[in-house]
Amino acid sequence: MDALATSINQFALELSKKLAESAQGKNIFFSAWSISASLAMVHLGAKGNTAAQMAQVLQFKRDQGVKSDPESEKKRKTEFNLSNSGEIHCNFQTLISEILKPNNDYILKTANAAYSEKTYPFHNKYLEDVKTYFGAEPQSVNFVEASDQIRKEINSWVERQTEGKIQNLLSDDSVGSTTRMVLVNALYFKGIWEHQFLVQNTTEKPFRINETTSKPVQMMFMKEKLQIFHIEKPQALGLQLYYKSCDLSLFILLPEDINGLEQLEKAITYEKLSKWTSADMMEVYDVQLHLPKFKLEESYDLKSTLSSMGMSDAFSESEADFSGMSSARNLFLSNVFHKAFVEIDEQGTEAAAGSGSEISFRIKVPSIEFNANHPFLFFIRHNKTNNILFYGRFCSP
């Protein structure tokens, strides 16, 4: 499962860079883990070059064409060994079970499904395998005659699965009579902090979008012993903030320079991120933390993004090979829709009142101010599996 976590985290960074190309000055928030699981469900029925391209984009296997730090190439070759399709999907089965295990300390609601035009029926074996490995049931629907009704039904299903938090995933023109197959993928997350933000400490403060522009935000504040890490090139400060029970952590990467976000995004690699956030790089500080209260709800139509990353055959009527999924010819992936929702606020710590003293340090630790009052990167990690569940940037309140 370690190799799969590495693959998903690498995919998260590659996807974030690709999304950033067309989202200058905009917030980004997505779940690479969930997108990867959705695409792996389709990869299960892919054959030939279609399967090979998907495996490459999802980082299931590496080649010389993928940029990497030279000093870590040898290590990579031992880590990325998911060349066996069965191994990939067994690993996903274990991972999904671990991440979605019932938990009272955070809410993680997912909606993950494939919908295919009913004239392209699925193989029974494929349906069985998808249910076994991914806990999902691909649906055969009537896009040809009732695409708008199907769209509404999909939206209703997603809304139910996410307890009403994610609505209208598919817009009016997102599917039509020529749609063959779509992937829908939506997540809602709300966590409970290990250490509390007090509501009375939240005040309106300026968030500096750049050197000349700022917007008011509700800035939360806490003073607590937290784990800090330093990034030298480019200069940035990192912080780990645990959710209750420490199953999950929020990591924030804050450039020293107000305009330093783009430089940090370009510099980041999987190897660097792993090094920066490793336990031996963390130091405990007495932190004065200023963190904006925010809510992000981002939607993505990923067809062009994934195609440009290298899996174009899956979206091509003439090139796609999904013969492991259906015996009907010309089945291809029409689109991949993704929506993720997160809230970062004080409310998450209501149930954690009094937990601030659970960890005590008798030795004096250095103090530091961590003021997230300008654009930063952040991600939420599932600590047991080392998986990045969500990845984002906050630059526009």
From Swiss-Prot:
GO molecular function: serine-type endopeptidase inhibitor activity
Residues with site note (Reactive bond): R362, I363
Localization, UniProt: Nucleus; Cytoplasm
Signal sequence extent: none
The entry's keywords: Cytoplasm, Nucleus, Protease inhibitor, Serine protease inhibitor
InterPro entries, sorted: Serpin_CS, Serpin_dom, Serpin_fam, Serpin_sf, Serpin_sf_1, Serpin_sf_2
Family: Belongs to the serpin family. Ov-serpin subfamily.
Name of the protein in its database record: Serpin B10
Native source organism of the sequence: Plecturocebus moloch (Dusky titi monkey)
